[in-house]
C-alpha cells in the first residue's frame, strides 16, 4: 500500500556538484519501486540553524513522494550509508503536496532582485555620481 511522504535531506556543501546525480539515483529508486514523485525541489546551499559536523551550510533537497514501505526503507537506508548526506527527515503526509513550497516561493521573489554585490556596487556608483553639496550663500556652515 502506497503512502505519501515528505522527505528532506541535507548534503555536505563540498558535495553540491554531486546532488543532481544523487537526485537521479533516488528518483530511479522511487520510480523503479512503482512510486510517484509529486514534488522535487533543489533548494541549493542554505544556512544551517546550528553547526553539523562543524559545517554552517548544507545543500537542501525536498521530495514529496508516494511509495510503499519497502521502497521508503530502501531510500532511508541509502541516505544512512551515504556519507555526503548529513541529515534526512521523512514525514508521513495525508495526501500529495504538489504546489511550490514557501522556501521556493521566497527564493523566486528574491530572484528578481540583483545579487547583493551587484546592489552594493550600484549603490556606490550612485553615491559617487551625486554632486558634492556646495555652499551657495558664501558663509561657512562651521560657524553655526
Curated annotation (Swiss-Prot):
<comment type="similarity">
    <text>Belongs to the bacterial ribosomal protein bS6 family.</text>
</comment>
<dbReference type="Pfam" id="PF01250">
    <property type="entry name" value="Ribosomal_S6"/>
</dbReference>
<keyword id="KW-0687">Ribonucleoprotein</keyword>
<protein>
    <recommendedName>
        <fullName>Small ribosomal subunit protein bS6</fullName>
    </recommendedName>
</protein>
<keyword id="KW-0689">Ribosomal protein</keyword>
<dbReference type="GO" id="GO:0003735">
    <property type="term" value="F:structural constituent of ribosome"/>
</dbReference>
<feature type="compositionally biased region" description="Basic and acidic residues">
    <location>
        <begin position="105"/>
        <end position="124"/>
    </location>
</feature>
<dbReference type="InterPro" id="IPR020814">
    <property type="entry name" value="Ribosomal_S6_plastid/chlpt"/>
</dbReference>
<feature type="region of interest" description="Disordered">
    <location>
        <begin position="97"/>
        <end position="144"/>
    </location>
</feature>
<dbReference type="InterPro" id="IPR000529">
    <property type="entry name" value="Ribosomal_bS6"/>
</dbReference>
<comment type="function">
    <text>Binds together with bS18 to 16S ribosomal RNA.</text>
</comment>
<dbReference type="GO" id="GO:0022627">
    <property type="term" value="C:cytosolic small ribosomal subunit"/>
</dbReference>
<dbReference type="GO" id="GO:0006412">
    <property type="term" value="P:translation"/>
</dbReference>
<dbReference type="InterPro" id="IPR035980">
    <property type="entry name" value="Ribosomal_bS6_sf"/>
</dbReference>
<keyword id="KW-0694">RNA-binding</keyword>
<dbReference type="InterPro" id="IPR014717">
    <property type="entry name" value="Transl_elong_EF1B/ribsomal_bS6"/>
</dbReference>
<keyword id="KW-0699">rRNA-binding</keyword>
<dbReference type="GO" id="GO:0070181">
    <property type="term" value="F:small ribosomal subunit rRNA binding"/>
</dbReference>
